[in-house]
Amino acid sequence: MSNHSKVSVPTATQQTALKFVLLIGILSFFADFTYEGSRSILGPYLASLQASAFAVGVITGFGELLGYSLRLVSGRLADRTQKFWPITILGYVVQMASVPLLALAGNWPLAALLIILERVGKATRNPPRDVMLSHAGKQIGYGWVFGMHEALDQFGALFGPLIVAWILALRGDYRLAFAALAIPAVINLSLLMLAYRTYPHPEEMEGNPPDIQTQGLPRVFWLYLAGAALVAAGFADFPLIAYHFAQASTVSPHLIPVFYAVAMGVSGTGSLVFGRLFDRFGFSILIVLTVIAALFAPLVFLGGFWLALLGMAIWGLGMGVHESIIPAAVAPMVSPQRRASAYGLFTAGYGIFWFLGSAMIGFLYGISFSAMIAFSVVLQLAAVPLFLLVARQTSQPQQNRGNSG
């Protein structure tokens, strides 16, 4: 009963934590609006600047790889200096400035530099920002915090490309579309400075530090990273799924974006639900959702129109799990003093295995559908025993832990 009353009547610190998460979530909405809007047209824009298909592949692939690997550096730097806000602000400034500057790129090498800088900015700001969010999670539940944040992220990622598509439909001008994205970029940076001034010390929400080892990272973290890496490696990227829909004529070309929108809607809504369920039930909910999400591959690659739509909804469910529960579970495993390094390492490893797995899935697509689907499903299900081990080594569900202080 006492636990229930705590949730029903939030303390002042819990109210502060909720307001902080909502503010970070809203500024993240405008960040995703900006860079996902730009990324939806990067391919054709580079082509208009006479970049070859090979150049486009190298630019985007190298940008993604750099964007994940640099999180190791950013996370370690944040832990060492404890300058979470300055590093976060630097990352956002670099990222938000890079997007509208694409309107001024006169050639594809300059555009490539800006595209890579945008990824560097994201890599710089993510680990310290996630640590600050995790402080709020100590008060209101790690799953709820990351679920709310991801839901707002996803809606930004949905509206940004839609507005860009609307601008292109009206004017057919890539440069105008990039220039228009300066508006959400400025809103993002304004809200970022408001958050910094309003909540200069989010670590105060942590309360009493948890009794977790501070030397190195605990064994349970490495087990969890191994399981998450398997899930990431088995998950197909949407461009390959869209490519298959077009090649197999499963879905009409004009409906493919609708399928993606359905997936994003499930992902954004699911993030909220899954985060709350994780706080209440712990790792058992992650295990159940991992098994369900593994079913997307046979549905999207072998099914007809309606089964493919169901598969995309399940794919979106998986994305919601990836973006809410999976990062939320890292925070209580690691002491606050090591958390930025842990997030940097975790997201770098997760991203690199996603990249390698996507490459293998794409390779198998041209050889054998059966092998490709088996690769995807087996790798995701192989994470379940590791998650079971992690569940045994972690304590009570995260909401209880968050409210115990």
How should these model regions be labeled?
Residues A103-I115, V300-G311:
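Helix-loop junctions at membrane interfaces in 12-TM secondary transporters
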Residues L70-K83, L168, G270-G282, Y365:
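Helix-to-loop junctions at the C-terminal end of transmembrane segments
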Residues P10-E64, L223-S252, I256-F259:
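Helix-loop boundary and gating motifs at the non-cytosolic
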